[in-house]
C-alpha cells in the first residue's frame, strides 16, 4: 500500500447526529462521536480497495481539535489521506470541514 490514497466521506448534520441526541453534550450541534465516525469512515474507505480480501481497518489512536461547531443542516466532509505506512500500521491525516 502506498502513501497518498485519499477518500472523502460526507454527512448532513441531522438531529440523530447531535451531541444532545448522542449523549455527548447538551447542544444540537454535530457530536464529536459522529465526527470521529465520519473521519474513521473516510480512512477506512481510502484503503479498503487495497486491503487483502477479508481484511479491514480498526482505529488505534485519534488526536483531534475542534475549530467550530457544525449546526443542524450543515454538510460536513471528512477527507482522509494515507500519510505513512509501517508494516500493518497505517497513519492518516484527516480534515473535517
Predicted regions and their residues:
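Catalytic strand-loop segment that frames the active site of acyl-thioester-processing enzymes
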Residues: 1-30
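Residue-level preference for beta-strand/loop junctions
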Residues: 3-5, 58, 74, 88
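Well-ordered beta-strand positions in beta-sheet-rich domains
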Residues: 6-10, 61, 93
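Residues at secondary-structure transition points
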Residues: 30-34, 61
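Short, residue-level hotspots on alpha-helical faces of the histone-fold
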Residues: 37-41, 45
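Hydrophobic beta-sheet segments that form the core/acyl-binding groove
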Residues: 64-97
Amino acid at each position: 500500500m502506498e502513501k497518498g490514497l485519499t477518500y472523502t466521506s460526507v454527512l448532513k448534520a441531522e438531529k440523530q447526529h447531535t451531541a444532545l441526541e448522542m449523549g455527548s453534550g447538551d447542544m444540537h450541534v454535530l457530536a464529536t462521536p459522529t465526527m470521529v465516525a465520519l473521519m474513521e469512515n473516510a480512512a477506512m474507505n481510502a484503503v479498503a480497495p487495497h486491503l487483502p480480501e477479508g481484511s479491514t481497518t480498526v482505529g488505534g489512536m485519534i488526536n483531534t481539535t475542534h475549530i467550530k461547531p457544525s449546526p443542524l443542516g450543515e454538510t460536513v466532509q471528512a477527507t482522509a489521506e494515507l500519510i505513512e505506512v509501517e508494516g500493518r500500521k497505517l497513519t492518516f491525516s484527516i480534515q473535517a470541514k
